[in-house]
Amino acid sequence: MQAYGRAFAHVYNKRWTGFAHRVGPLLLEFYANTTGGEAKQSVLDLCCGTGQLALHFLEQGFHVTGIDLSEHMLQYAGENASAYVETGQAQFVQADAADFSLDRQFGLIVSTFDALNHLESEEALLGCFRSVFAVLLDGGIFVFDLNTRAGLMRWNNIHIDDGEEAMIVTRGFFDGQGSRAYTRVSGFIRAANGQYDRFEETVYNTVFDMAWVRDALLQAGWRDVHVAQLDALAAPIAEPEMEDRVFFVARK
């Protein structure tokens, strides 16, 4: 998994928080309606980025641990949730999602914004599932999203975001012969001194077969697994490969 740099973390914190604001309320509602969910007030945000999703749970009284490989993402997460960090309600830990361990367990573990597509192989994803299983309470829920092959095939595009604080060029490319899609993000961001700093980062998404992912979860130990859409997390869908993005829901 990639560890993103300081400039990219800055852009992410400023420009790419919308998905967390969208999924946060829906995840909260889904978890509150699961058996025992309201009593397990501990959440692990896996690949937490700058902590925007963690804030949704913190504001509702949950204790949240965030994991990310990027120290720069974690710095922003700590700043964004500083009031909760000071009281001990939140903590942020640098670790690799493919292989990690913690000294506590959680009732809910989430990973969103196709973070697990950033793992480089099936072996790495299976390692992630095993690590998650070990820190999930019995009866706990693991919810994560993945971009499908159909969704990643739409990445052949270019987008320019030009404003006073930043100029960002995003170029997407899907490797039809391989199993990855790439996004090259480059541009300039205005620093505190008024000057503009150049940055460049390439983000990749690995294509995973949705049937294999389900089987890997069962292999890792989950007893109940289904695939859903964001707006109906409790309702299984029959053809996940037909969607651009899907959510896996697994109960231990």
What are these regions (language model features)?
Residues 1-47:
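Conserved class I S-adenosyl-L-methionine
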Residues 52-99:
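Class I SAM-dependent methyltransferase SAM/SAH-binding core
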Residues 98-108:
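A short acidic, Gly/Pro-enriched loop at the edge of an enzyme's catalytic core
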Residues 107-123:
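A short SAM/SAH-binding and catalytic strip from SAM-dependent methyltransferases
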Residues 126-138:
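A short glycine-rich, Lys/Arg-flanked "PGG" loop and its adjoining helix->strand segment in the class I
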Residues 143-214:
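SAM-dependent methyltransferase
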Residues 208-252:
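C-terminal lobe and adjacent flexible extensions of AdoMet/dcAdoMet transferase-like proteins
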